[in-house]
Amino acid sequence: MGRSFVYVILGGGVAAGYAALEFANKGIAHGELCIISDEPVAPYERPALSKGFLLPEAPARLPAFHTCAGVNEERLTPKWYEEHGIELILDTRVTSADVRRKTVVTAAGETVSYKFLIIATGARALKLEEFGVSGSDAENVCHLRDLADATRLVDLMQASTGGNAVVIGGGYIGMEVAASLVINKINVTMVFPEPHCIPRLFTPKIASFYEEFYKSKGVNFVKGTVLSSFVINPEGKVTGVNLKDGSYLPADLVVVGIGIRRNTSLFEGQLTLEKGGIKVNSMLQTSNSSVYAVGDVASFPVKAFGEIRRLEHVDAARKSARYAVSAIMEPDTTPEFDYLPFFYSRAFSFSWQFYGENLGEAVYFGDFSGTSFGAYWVHNGHLVGSFLEGGSKEEYEALAKATRLRPAIDDMSDLERQGLRFVVTLSQKQLVLPIVDVGSSTSLVVLEKPEYPWHAAAGVVAAASIAAFAYWYGRRRRRCWMVPFLFPSPRRLWLSNLLFLCSKSSASSLI
């Protein structure tokens, strides 16, 4: 016995919530969509777990951070799903999937069939046992991946005020949790094998700024080594950790943030995997055309890099989820997924954003002794990545636009001198293609201003050529087939629109 839906989302994290909103916006019927999640609550914004949820005063709690609060849209509470006819199958683990038969089976033995499946299973936190260290199940050792983890961590922090915490890992989670521990009046030591924090994005210069600030707040850094064992008392509680370099650290609380592993096991042997995730095409389709993958679990083509990448960040989850719904419901009009890699973090009073990739030579700008500074990365003569701490909304938007353009950089010293002004000026020069109402039953897409100078030149040449040909042909007293398109009547306007849109699409593919 089972149930059948048109659309099934497997997983109940960030991506599931954003996909659900997109389905609702596109007008699916009641009863067509279900979300199957092993968590007991409706989809929520996971970034809150390492930020607002851990605050000692006025902490974030549900329903405040249900999706889609992260982009200031409607919060999708359980009531919202009910009102939109979307079935939430919560606290339910899926034990098997058959993509040929289009079914998934739950731990309770129920079979759920679908027409289209979106895999949004995300990832799980890596455990130290996977590196040969036992003891992660001790009562005061925490990971941070879901609401249950965060709730447990809050309880342990409250019991450890004034005590010692050891944070294993120097990435996003480690840095954000360390800040929260300090705010909760706990002494913090961070341990990681790399030479500096957040090594996947930060240069030594950028990392040094944050590390020095953390040190001023009492955080101790132990770099270049890893945890080798826990010291556990007879009650099953960790009292300290031994490090591979031979040192010992007392601990009332240990938080482990050493990375994630994607939840792909249900589909191994059925779908193509690449780089640790489920491989999808530029429409986010897997090797089975009825199955899509989004968020952390997906390995997708990144046009800016020209290769398949996995991007483990909430922004990619949000945008890929919405895109997949569009690709499923409007496949003929949905362009290829063109995502600009984006990462951000907030801790203490700091807030930074990163776009693109940190490849090539770094060019720094701003005041590294203050609160606003940044960096560009230049590779093969083009700006390919950018970072900014303490920017305004407009400055971050300019950073994103400029990085997507990958402008040529001829003078590195001039780029350094201009600093943030470079991307602000560049973004102001880039103009959009608006849709203009021409007063008929349709709208004509009009190229009001060119995105690039050669676009304008090409447009002028093409227009002049067509006009000259039409004039020459008209002089021969023959009807010019182009005239209806150059001077359309209302009845012919739709065809003019169509031809223009086709040419616009072709041009866009070259940009």
PLM-predicted stretches and their roles:
Residues 1-10, 22, 74-164, 224, ...:
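FAD-binding core/adjacent interface of flavoenzyme oxidoreductases
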Residues 2-5, 297-397, 443-459, 465-470:
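Mid-to-C-terminal Rossmann-like scaffold of FAD/NAD(P)H-dependent oxidoreductases
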Residues 11-14, 145-146, 169-171:
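Glycine-rich Rossmann-fold phosphate-binding loop(s) that bind the pyrophosphate
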Residues 137-161, 237-242, 246-323, 411-425:
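FAD-site-proximal beta/loop scaffold in flavoenzymes
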Residues 148, 152-202:
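Rossmann-like NAD(P)H-binding beta-loop-alpha module
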Residues 450-481, 492, 498, 502:
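Terminal signal-anchor or tail-anchor transmembrane helices
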